[in-house]
Amino acid sequence: LGIVPMATEVAHICGAAMGHFTGMGVEVTADVPDFTGVLEAFQSLRAVLFATLMAPILEQNRVQIAPEIIGNIERGLKIDLAQIFAAERVRIALYQKMLTFFESHDFLICPAASIPPFPVEQRFVTEIDGKPCATYIDWFAITFALTMTACPVVSVPCGFTATGLPVGVQIVGKPPGEAALLRAARQFEQSLGLAKQLPINPHNGRGVI
């Protein structure tokens, strides 16, 4: 979507998976709607939600809340109406862009995350392929950007890294187009042969490649 850095291996795996759509008789293009301003708009709306739900908790139990969450809540408390209106305008404009996109396209496809799975001991990702992340949620910004579209989305596995870690794509359908989206996702998953495959071998804990 051109909004955050993408790990080279993830981009390669997802790009290779697009060949399966071509094999299914689908024309694949590099066309993408304009997502300018979407991340900042989402961050503003998210912060307002955090402040709405958690400001009382922050007052009572600040020491028990992670610093990143405190930052979200405090940001939300500082956001004014003008910023909320601006974020909502971005959301509305994006929805219109998606409708225009779907006049000539059936689906929008992109990676499910910017990086492969990282160690459970690691709280969050601070850089992607050497490029620093602006926030602690940048590594999955490509998912919440699609939340802003108000379109149906499904995530489907599409391959594995060299170390056996799973990688997936998100398929976005036109609203309301859940039935067509699920059919396309099922056909894609079957074409990859991953429908019944375990990402991790339960006997040895190693990835299946």
Map each language-model feature to its residues.
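Short, Asp-centered acidic motifs that coordinate Mg2+ and/or phosphate
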Residues: 106-108
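Tryptophan-centric aromatic hotspots in well-structured domains and transmembrane helices
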Residues: 35, 42, 71, 95, ...
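Short glycine/threonine-rich loop-to-helix capping motif typified by GTGT followed
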Residues: 8-11, 39-49, 119-125
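Short, surface-exposed loop/helix-turn segments at secondary-structure junctions
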Residues: 86, 118-139
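A generic structural motif
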Residues: 25-29
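Short helix-loop capping/hinge segments that flank enzyme active sites or metal/cofactor-binding pockets
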Residues: 47-99, 111, 115-116, 120, ...
